[in-house]
Amino acid sequence: MVVVATSASGARKVATIKTASGPIETGVGFLSLPPADNVTQFKRVRAAGANYLVIRPVAWSSIAPSGATEPTGFQPTDPADPNYKWSGLDTQVKAAVAAGLKPILIVTKAPQWAEGSGRSGGPGTYKPSPSKLAKFLTAAARRYSGTFMDLPRVRYWGIWSEPNLNTFMSPQTVGGKSFSPGWYRSMLNAAADALHGVNSSNVVIGGETAPFGVKSADRFGTMPIAFMEKVLCISEKGVRNKKTKKISSYVYKPACKAKTKVDVWSHHPYTQGGPTFRAKLHGNASLGDLGDMRNVLNAAIKAKNVVSSKKIRFWVTEFSWDSKPPDPKGVPIAMETRWVSEMLYRTWSSGVSLVTWFILRDQPTNLQWQSGLYYLGSTGVSSDKPKPILRAFRFPFVAIPQVVSKKKTIVQLWGRTPTSSAGSVVIERKSGSKWKKVKTLSANGSGIFKASITKPANTVLFRARLADGSDQSVAFSLKAPKHPWKGCPFGTC
């Protein structure tokens, strides 16, 4: 049993997690462009300090043969079967590895012959067959085993995109009862057996959940924490304070005997506000709710409901804010630059060890996503311009004030070096028009540096720079924005 307390007033607070001591690696997502542009883009991802490239969607339905039935003679576990169409993915994987990146392949969308009968949802979403998915993943893992033709090794495999949404997996409920979590668990287990069967060091990433759902799940989707609890067979119960009658703690217990085979649980914690924003409804999960998700995962691990030969990790495999400009409803770029550094700090504090930014470059303004690290150029990739947030993503640094008494304020310093490697980092404060040294910190082997200092008088801005002078962070103000942005992901409201 795991008990998690809330605030004394009964309101939920950010769940307390032991101060993280591990790494916080980064990645960037990729939306397909002509192959000629891949090399430039992937080099930019690496230059952004990222080690991972998320390739999504890897549409099973686009690689496998189409139609209502499997073709005669089709060998679904054979990566060389002529019915498969791998060439586009081959090109992306080869270019990513050549750029020094680790590809994460997010597999989704079933071919028609691998769906359940009587489809009521969108194409590729309806009761995807766990056994047929396993055969496809066997072929894919063999193809990218590092020993097939001239193709490189792929180790990281995400199973489905946002399976708690009707858009990607249906039905969410059957007869008014939750259905998708149990079906998804079967898919995860089949996928894990297939991928680990090819190579035991393959990493199976589960979850990939969207941040928002509704209680009547079939109208839209299942709340991500509720979905997670059902997949991992954990029940949650609120315990009410006897005086206030409000929930003062949560108790997590095993809810069934089913086991889930997964190496990483991942989430997409988009927000309607800044880095500490919590979803309005309990069960949904934005950035400020990651501690709650971590508590569910910890409870499942403690109950031995999760089966893995590896240390089970918690990742954010998709996140971003649209920026203004170019999106008139996006986050003002100066505010977003601050928030990117703080987002990486807050996710690290919640036990997240990998964060991937949704896309590298903006889409045109007549499309949905202007959340890239680069502004879209007028004449193609070569004319793209980096946004100020790129430096914050590459070299995150925060200085968070904490008032101890009327006369004393502590400043919590945290950052990560651009290459996620050890070294000396100089912390500076702005005094008048000049920057003055505060102290020198040692970054650990993962590039993390941190310290607590007493706030110097008349100081608002801090920054970090590498001791060799080769790079420096964006300056971070002790004064948070007075009127922080509130809106919808991708400027949709």
Language-model regions, residue ranges each:
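Boundary/entry segment of secreted carbohydrate-active catalytic domains
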Residues: K13-V58
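Structural recognition of the beta-strand scaffold that forms the well-ordered cores
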Residues: E25-F30, N51-S61, K102-V107, R155-I159, ...
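Substrate-binding cleft and catalytic face of glycoside hydrolase catalytic domains
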Residues: A48-G221, Y252, Q272
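Glycine-centered loop-to-beta-strand initiation motif
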Residues: L441-K455, A464
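Surface-exposed loop/edge segments in extracytoplasmic proteins
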Residues: S433-T440
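Secretory targeting and sorting signals
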Residues: M1-G10
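Noncatalytic carbohydrate-binding groove/subsite architecture in carbohydrate-active enzymes
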Residues: D37-V39, I106, A134, T138-F148, ...
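Aromatic-rich peripheral "rim/lid" segments of glycoside hydrolase catalytic domains that contact
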Residues: E70-P71, Q75, G158, P163, ...
